[in-house]
């Protein structure tokens, strides 16, 4: 991970970390990064602290995209297959890491989390599943738990259109990147 400062200087802030699947700024400074585990990385000295180890989730092969809510909880998708290893997709999960460091599984049946974002009021979580070709929406409770998901947008079959990143604008509109450039 590289940092471009306001003066235009580039520096490497997360050296020698393979497989970064997602990252978010942490409220106390530094970054939260996903990949082989979920870790906090200091932007000052590069110190790393594991927040969620891969072996904490049975059958998980890694973590992909993640985001944080207003309270500082971390929402992340786990993988249950090697995405670039030629394996057939197997469902992973959507998890939340609470403020006390505990992890809860919120939703099952996720093939490839590739975008997470909250509505401006924090009451809805949007979740793109690249291999399923859809964006899910969840209602979010005050404790960070979510209700059952509903289909927010279907982009295709995960082959012809691949939702590969998601951002929610200040006006509440949801922007989804398509890895195949179909729209």
Give the residues covered by each predicted segment:
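A short loop-to-beta-strand structural motif that recurs across blades of beta-propeller domains
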Residues: 1-2, 37-39, 85, 92-95, ...
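Structural recognition of the beta-propeller blade-terminating site
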Residues: 5, 42-44, 98, 139
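Short coil/turn linkers that define WD40 beta-propeller blade boundaries
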Residues: 7-9, 46, 101-102, 133, ...
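A short beta-strand motif characteristic of beta-propeller blades
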Residues: 8-15, 49-56, 102-108, 148-156
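Beta-rich, blade/repeat-based domains predominating
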Residues: 16-35, 56-74, 80-81, 91-93, ...
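A generic, well-ordered mixed alpha/beta core segment in the N-terminal half of proteins
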Residues: 40-53, 62-66
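Short loop/turn segments immediately following beta-strands, especially the blade-tip
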Residues: 138-145
